[in-house]
């Protein structure tokens, strides 16, 4: 300790010399040195004092005077201070050190000297361990919490999440040095203890920089980390092999492919989201969505988010996000939302045919629809599968008619039906294998068709279909999935998201409460009409996603609006809206007659809403 103290003392003297030189009126160094030497009894606390003194630049002059004129007085003052600090423990004093030193850091000379002194001091004396900057501490906590929550979120039972976890662990181990860096910046203590030399250099570098710069760098670090995480999650997601090609596909035709079957879309979107969105944010969103979108597959929400991000139209993105919020809808909803522009045209394709199909298909029961679905799958597969969800059929049929009217979409419609098609599929992928098998069968076509099918159209029909169908089979699956997700959902991450504005949107996706905002937001603009339809759609459908009935109601509402909007939005679509309305009313009456309790209620609510 003696040698350490001596070194510190020398540093201290040098530092004071520099400080006083820097300060307006340099005091005779000899006096300062003399005062320092006179204070030999306190060599140990001197280092601590020096930060205290330097911390006050203005006062430092006075101090210099004091030292020159009345060293004893200063000594007593400093002694008190040192005693106090010693009581607090040297570590504490170190923290004082650090807290106080930043202010003077504005002066170049002082900054440099201080940083060197501190560096040495840190390495030699273990004061650094307690040396936590308060400001940094909070940020550290946040970051740590984020990483933990991510870990926790991803450490869910599902194999996919497990896989993701493993990947993340691997990645984290790779990127841990970086993370530790970041934390090191926040956590001088551990830094100094564990890797003193490196941290100290890091620290000195940071200290050399202005505090703002340090923060910036820290931010950068965190961004990088999040980026790695981002990459991670998409990779993990892409680890689902089947959906990888789809991902590629989705990426190629992000809008169209968004319609890609659930898992593919999910993955692709997830991947896309990191790709398209700013990395850090997208990752957060990704995970957040993953966690937060309970009803639908989180991936779907993430996917839709990625698509949102990827998709050129901002409004659409938002709505997509919302859609993804229902991920059950999200596949459709956001799919529709993203291609909505496309969808407008497709929808125009044959509103009449859509109406026709909805008419024909709606009438049949689920079984009939399913039979039809099987028989039609090739040709009318889109519409019939939709019908296949005959119970969804009223919606699905309208939807499917829309799908079928867009022949490319028709296939999508099956996807829809199936996966509600995609969304179900997504769900089924993550949620229920049994469903998945069925939707899986159709899902490839659905995927392709979905991308083909206008997302907006998808949106409509999926929501309808989704409602009734989901209400039954999917509602259970969804319940299951939701329970699982919910477990994951309410993680610290979620809480943090609640606090930070950047996550508000994701949160909205998750919570029905918030959804009304997007629900209303889109209505104003006609270009927004697409996005707004999508948005409404997604908001209403996601909102109702959990309750298929309410979902269908809000969806129908949003659908009605979006369709109207769509018609107003695109003249080509405008014919379609009428037919759509027709098919919708038809589906309404049909679903009513069908009296599948859920379908019925959804149709009823739907019709009532529409009215």
Swiss-Prot record:
Residues 270-290, 322-341 have a biased composition (Polar residues). Specifically expressed in neuronal cells (at protein level). Expressed in the cerebellum. InterPro entries: SRRM_C, SRRM_Domain-Containing. It is found in: Nucleus. The lineage of its organism: Eukaryota, Metazoa, Chordata, Craniata, Vertebrata. Residues 107-123, 131-189, 217-226, 483-498, 550-564, 581-595 have a biased composition (Basic residues). It comes from Homo sapiens. Residues 38-248, 263-611 are annotated as: Disordered. Keywords: Differentiation, mRNA processing, mRNA splicing, Nucleus, Phosphoprotein, RNA-binding. It comes from the Eukaryota. Residues 203-216, 462-482, 499-508 have a biased composition (Basic and acidic residues). GO terms for molecular function: identical protein binding; mRNA binding. The keyword Phosphoprotein applies. Coiled coil: none annotated. This is Serine/arginine repetitive matrix protein 4. GO terms for cellular component: nucleus. GO terms for biological process: cell differentiation; mRNA processing; nervous system development; neuron maturation; regulation of alternative mRNA splicing, via spliceosome; regulation of RNA splicing; RNA splicing; sensory perception of sound. Pfam families: SRRM_C (PF15230). Phosphorylated. Belongs to the nSR100 family. Residues 190-202, 291-301, 390-422, 430-461, 522-549, 565-580, 596-611 have a biased composition (Low complexity). The gene is SRRM4. Splicing factor specifically required for neural cell differentiation. Acts in conjunction with nPTB/PTBP2 by binding directly to its regulated target transcripts and promotes neural-specific exon inclusion in many genes that function in neural cell differentiation. Required to promote the inclusion of neural-specific exon 10 in nPTB/PTBP2, leading to increased expression of neural-specific nPTB/PTBP2. Also promotes the inclusion of exon 16 in DAAM1 in neuron extracts.
